[in-house]
Every structure is written in structure tokens, then in C-alpha cells.
Amino acid sequence: SDTVDVVQVKPVDPLFKSYVSIGNSITAGYQSAGINDSTQRQSYAVLFARQVNTNFRIPLLNKPGCPPPIANFVTQELVGGPGAPPCALRANEATPGPINNVAVPGATSLSPTGAVPGPDTLVENALTTFILGGETQVQRAAEARPTFVSVWIGNNDVLNASLSGILPATPGISNGVTAIGAFTTNYKNLVKSLKAIPSIRGGVLIGVVNTINVPILFRAALLNDPTVKGAFDAAAGTTTALDPTTCSPSTTSLINFQLAGAIRSGAHPPTIFCEALPAPFAPVGNVYVLDAAEQVAVSDTVAAYNALIAAEADTLGFAFVDPNPALAALKADPNQVPPFPN
């Protein structure tokens, strides 16, 4: 673990005497498909701890990472190079003690409490074990006797399905979108658990990101631009064929840039369809493609999630932050988020 350096001895306010962050990849410091001690120190939770001048212990992961982050977006080279191990494990603790960043990459709305028996409980992936050591996020949080808590959870309830282009749960392809009823149960269990921690004096609940605005999804219509098409083909490692019937300049579909990697690896044919092909199920045109109807479904689900989170923040006396207006503004500015990934 590591303690964030602070300039003064005391926090800016007693409210921040002990700050704990609960969440998933973004909170943990996961970047570029990997995580290590450098990316962990760039987490917004670490930056916030510095702003309020409070000690903040993070469960450091040795370089090159677990897994190592991508060092080159085009070639997909990893930090540490071709010989890098898939996981360099946790760093040794100089001074054992409670951790303040209990977030785990891949966590869903169920994860902080792990209250329901099943595969999505205490042990979801190796990082769950390395970071939490067999406990839940809430249990680990309570050990730090937090006075202030931030919670950003729920993105993974919709992200994987949005990026795969398949909204129903489909083994080997998509985790599916968590139903609003299930999300409600999970989140209320989390709030109930937070209310049971007597040291908490305040906090903030952060809303779920509308995943149609994530930078890795780009407008399929851009592929009609030869420059964009050339850049995509370079990433795919071959000249791809654009289906003229579904990929017209007027299409509103979104494409996950990971489609290029799937084509390069041979997992997807070098033909791009921008709309779903006929049922019962045709992966081409479905996988990695989010059409107009799917975008509406995702947006409606996220809106329902966030209405619940805002209401639960009120019951706790916490602040609620909706990240979507700021993220949408960033994506609308090509100087901040390029229309096509680069």
C-alpha cells in the first residue's frame, strides 16, 4: 500500500479525516486496459485526497501491472514489452493498515456488498482478491473508519453490453445490461451497508456514465471518409470492405474501435456492417455495433439508474454528481475527444 503525500498534517476539514473511495476501474486507476502503481496514483480518488489534504492508502500493484496497460494504441504493445508477465502482483506493504481506495476493476452494482450468492460475489477476478483479500468493498471501507465516502459504481452494469453491441446477456459475447430492478436491489443494499458504518459523516454518489458517449465508440458514418477508413484499416491490419447498404453517410450507428482489433486477430471478417443483419442471430453487424434503437435503450437504462442513485444520495444526505453533462461536452469538442480514436 501507499500513502499519498500531503503538505500539511491535518485535512482541510475534519469531514475528510478518513476518506474512502468505493468503485470500479476508473476509481481504482485502471487505464489503457491495465493497471499498475503509476496509473493507480492518477485515479481521481487520489487527486481528491490530495485536494482535501488527507492521507490515502492505495493497494499498489507492481509494474508492469496486473495486467500491464497498453503502451502503444496502434500496435497494442504493452508496458514492459512482449515478455511482460500478465500480472506482477501486489507490492509489499511497508506499513500494513487499512486501505482507502477499495475500488476494483470490473466491479458491478452487486460487488460492493456481494450480498447475493453466485459468481458475481466476493471473488470476481484476480484483482478482487489482490485488492480486497477476501472481503467486500464495504467491509474493507469500514476498516478505515471513513468520515467521507465517494461511490462511483454501476458503469459495468451497462458498459460491456454497450461495447459488445449485444444488450441481452449472451455467453462468450456480452454480460448483458443489468435490469433496472436488479440494479435497484443491488444499490439499495449498498446504501443500507453504508448507513451501518457509524463513522461516516458525509459523501458523494456519482452517477453512471451514459456509455454511448465513451470515446472508444465512434460514428460509423465517419468510415465514409477515406482518411478515417485508412486509419481504421491500418489498425485492422487489412483493407476492410464497407457494406454500402448499412454504412451510408446517414447512418447513426456507433462502432466500437475494438472491431479493428478483432479483424486483425481474425476473430471478425474484414467486412463492416453498420446495422444488424437478419435474426435469429447474426454476429456481423451486431457485435461491436450499437444501432439507434440500442442507443436509446442504453440511454433510458442509464437515466433510470441515475434517478435511483440521486434519490439514494438524498436518503444518505450525500451529494449526487451526474458526470454525463461534462462528458458529453468533452466529446462534442474535437480538441478534447477526437471524433475517431487516435
Regions found by a protein language model. Give the residues of each.
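Short, solvent-exposed loop/turn and secondary-structure capping segments
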Residues: 30-35, 60, 160-165, 214-219, ...
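Active-site-proximal beta-strand/loop segments in catalytic clefts of secreted hydrolases
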Residues: 22-25, 151-156, 163-164, 206-210, ...
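Catalytic nucleophile-elbow at a beta strand-turn-alpha helix junction centered on a G-D-S/GDSL motif
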Residues: 19-33
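Loop/turn elements at helix/coil->beta-strand transitions in domains of secreted/extracellular proteins
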Residues: 15-18, 56, 144-149, 197-203, ...
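Mobile gating loops/cap/lid regions near enzyme active sites that modulate substrate access
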Residues: 217-300, 304-342
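Bacterial Sec-dependent N-terminal signal peptides
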Residues: 1-17
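Conserved SGNH/GDSL esterase-like catalytic core that processes O-acyl groups on lipids
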Residues: 35-189
